A protein has these predicted regions:
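Residue position within the beta-strands of beta-propeller blades
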Residues: 19-22, 81-84, 130-133, 171-175, ...
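Structural motif
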Residues: 27-42, 89-98, 137-144, 179-187, ...
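Short loop/turn segments that connect beta-strands within beta-propeller blades
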Residues: 45-49, 101-105, 146-150, 189-193, ...
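Blade-level signature of beta-propeller repeat domains, shared across WD40, Kelch, NHL, RCC1
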Residues: 256-292
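Repeated scaffold domains used in trafficking and secretory/extracellular systems
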Residues: 6-16, 62-77, 116-126, 158-169, ...
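A short beta-strand motif characteristic of beta-propeller blades
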Residues: 1-3, 50-64, 106-113, 150-156, ...
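Beta-strand-rich domains and repeat architectures in extracellular enzymes and scaffolds
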Residues: 2-29
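Solenoidal tandem-repeat scaffolds enriched in leucines and small polar residues
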Residues: 88-93, 113-147, 154-164, 173-179
Length: 292
């Protein structure tokens, strides 16, 4: 499947017979930023082959702006695609959280920054809610958006969070980094409206003894499974929230992990790894439900 603008595909997600991606012709992408030049988000219906234009603009922003106009992260669940981008009104251009419904082809703004000093982290979506972090002069705050009721709500976490994702029933967040302190993984139960600290460097359910600072990177969710990697090294972990077990898949990893995938059968986990010594790329697969 080719890109639609002959640009660079920068991120993607897929679930429930949909594949969504963002692309850009922005020459600044090579330095990991974007000035907003000819970016777009598309969705492909894998049942019919139809490709849908979701959103996009051809703008030029100064490099000094405090937000990235190009969506660097997409979250897909059911018919909903969510991402952080921007919106414009008579007062100017502001960062925003956007929701696109693939069924009715409507684009909705879940939240808009009230000033250029406010930015958003990458949102995550389940079949009812969008969850995202908002950053301003006071630090970070955690927000949810009820898609059906069109209502926002702020949820106070036990401590400031730096990364979040949502599952069927939970919000999972990583505590903000502090020097010489391990990060912690917190879980918010929607049904009981309650936070709990689930994983840190002292947690007994963790499979191995932790000799160094515990770090969580690239948090991802599918059903009630959470995956993450440490910032350094090639370890890979899966947490089954329902059984409260952590699987250490490090022994199954033989190369550098490029990214983690959830196939359409969500009992399985697939990741892409490469070998620095050879041009070989592998896609190991493991059935995480039986491992749990």
């Amino acid at each position: 499947m080719d890109t639609q603008t002959n640009g660079t595909m920068t991120t993607f997600d897929y679930k429930d017979n949909w594949f969504v991606w963002s692309e850009s012709q922005d020459t600044e992408l090579r330095v990991g930023s974007s000035i907003g030049e000819n970016w777009a988000v598309y969705a492909a219906d894998l049942r019919t082959g139809e490709i849908i234009f979701v959103d996009g603009e051809n703008d030029f922003f100064p490099k000094t702006r405090n937000f990235d106009p190009h969506p660097w992260s997409l979250s897909l669940n059911g018919s909903f695609v969510v991402y952080a981008s921007y919106t414009a009104n008579e007062d100017g251009i502001y960062p925003a959280i956007k929701i696109y419904d693939l069924n009715n082809h409507k684009l909705e703004i879940a939240d808009t920054a009230d000033s250029m000093q406010t930015t958003f982290g990458s949102p995550s979506v389940n079949d009812k809610n969008v969850v995202y972090l908002k950053y301003d002069s006071n630090g970070s705050s955690l927000w949810t958006y009820d898609i059906e009721k069109h209502k926002r709500m702020c949820i106070e976490p036990p401590e400031p969070l730096q990364e979040i994702c949502i599952t069927n029933s939970f919000i999972v967040g990583v505590s903000e980094w502090q020097q010489q302190k391990s990060e912690s993984l917190y879980c918010y139960d929607f049904a009981h409206k309650k936070w709990s600290k689930q994983i840190d460097a002292t947690t007994k359910l963790y499979p191995n003894n932790i000799d160094s600072t515990l770090e969580f990177a690239e948090l991802q969710s599918s059903n009630d499974f959470i995956t993450w990697r440490p910032i350094t090294g090639n370890a890979l972990y899966v947490w089954d929230i329902t059984t409260n077990k952590v699987l250490d898949l490090s022994e199954n990893v033989s190369g550098l992990i490029d990214y983690v995938l959830y196939p359409f059968d969500e009992d399985y986990l697939v990741w892409c790894e490469t070998n620095t010594q050879t041009p070989e790329t592998k896609y190991p697969c493991i059935k995480i439900s039986s491992e749990s």
